[in-house]
């Protein structure tokens, strides 16, 4: 299942009283913009009970062009990683166990 921003806004409208559809869309956009800008400034994000978004620098490494077999360098870059909290992992595992 994919959960879109529009679906998140719909959930907010359904579960929070006095929130309009437009307000919910703006809240969702502001939430993700805050995550984007915080990561762009080089900071990590920790959401209690959910997980951590971290920045990791990956060094340059050798790669290979699959068509030609030619060796090409893969440039150094910064990537975002997500590590789920123990609480989230436990909830997922509990749900998985109930489904089996």
Swiss-Prot record:
One of the record's GO molecular function terms: structural constituent of chromatin
GO BP, sorted A to Z: DNA recombination; positive regulation of metabolic process; regulation of DNA-templated transcription; regulation of translation
Gene3D superfamilies given in the database record: IHF-like DNA-binding proteins
Annotated segments matching region Disordered: 53-72
SMART domains per UniProt: BHL
HAMAP family xrefs: IHF_alpha
Alphabetical list of PANTHER family matching this protein: DNA-BINDING PROTEIN HU, INTEGRATION HOST FACTOR SUBUNIT ALPHA
Family: Belongs to the bacterial histone-like protein family.
Role, per record: This protein is one of the two subunits of integration host factor, a specific DNA-binding protein that functions in genetic recombination as well as in transcriptional and translational control.
Record's protein name: Integration host factor subunit alpha
Organism in which the protein naturally occurs: Neisseria gonorrhoeae (strain ATCC 700825 / FA 1090)
